[in-house]
Amino acid sequence: MTAIFKREVRSSFHGMIGYVLTAFMLAATAIYFVALNLGYGLTDFGYYTLYRTTFVLLLYIPVLTMRSFAEERRTRTDQLLLTSPVSVWEIVLGKFFALCVIFALPCLADAVMILVLAALGATGTATLANLAALLCYYLMGCAAIAIGVFLSSLTENQIIAAVAGVAALLLAYMMPSLRSMFTAGSAVALALFTAIAAVLSVVAGLRTRSFTLGCLTFAGCCVVLTALFLLQSSWLTEAFSAVLSGLCLFTPFEEFVNNSFSISTLVYYLTVTMLFLFFTAQGLEKRRWN
């Protein structure tokens, strides 16, 4: 894993991509920091700077992660990785940690800005709140990186990986607005969960190479969903809302910086990170055995 980690970091800064992305993030953060925190004397770095620059991640993260596995597949060097005496998890974590280190560079600069505010008179409580917001911001970025790495593992084209990453993060960014549009009843919720059941059934059938198991899985899910629709439709509606809330990747950070410091927010980002790393590892494991 160490060798993969070093190679990934080295390759990012061997060309211009690592420097350009870091400078891009620093420039975006510095603009808000100078204009709001220094210009108006505002000590809340989390809300006035970090939260207002989350939209930058919609472009930064996909460009950062697009090469992670797509380039390996294009050059066929992924075959060397998959046949090397290292586990799939070591490959995934080596690349993931390397990207997290690159993302940590602008975050370290953000920490310096927080210390500047402390030197200019920000209270100890405000400084701790700013550092907590920075930690949450970093974990949110790591979750987005995990999503980008997963999407990159699905294709050998970097452009497709980047576009898919932008689309996925843009959907998550706009989900609060979309959620307010989908004040749907139980019928729409039933349709959504039926579609999810169909996808899961296909995956189960492919993983086990059993068409019968896939059909039985889908039939069982349909029976359960129909029973809930007829007997307790409110559960479907509540679950529908919960699913949409879970897709709002940036909303927990907004709530976190609005004086709602919750451990559940940090756990949410860690869970999203582990989930997509697991998806990536499973995909690579399947390709290794094929």
Predicted segments with their positions:
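Hydrophobic alpha-helical transmembrane segments
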Residues: 1-71, 112, 203-213, 218, ...
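Helix-loop interface residues and adjacent transmembrane-helix termini in multi-pass membrane transporters
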Residues: 13, 85, 154-155, 260
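Residues that define the loop-to-transmembrane-helix transition and helix capping
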Residues: 19, 89, 158-159, 264
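Secretory targeting signals
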Residues: 29-36, 40-56, 98-165, 173-184
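Helix-loop-helix units of permease transmembrane domains in multi-pass membrane transporters
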Residues: 68-100
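Transmembrane helix segments
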Residues: 158-255
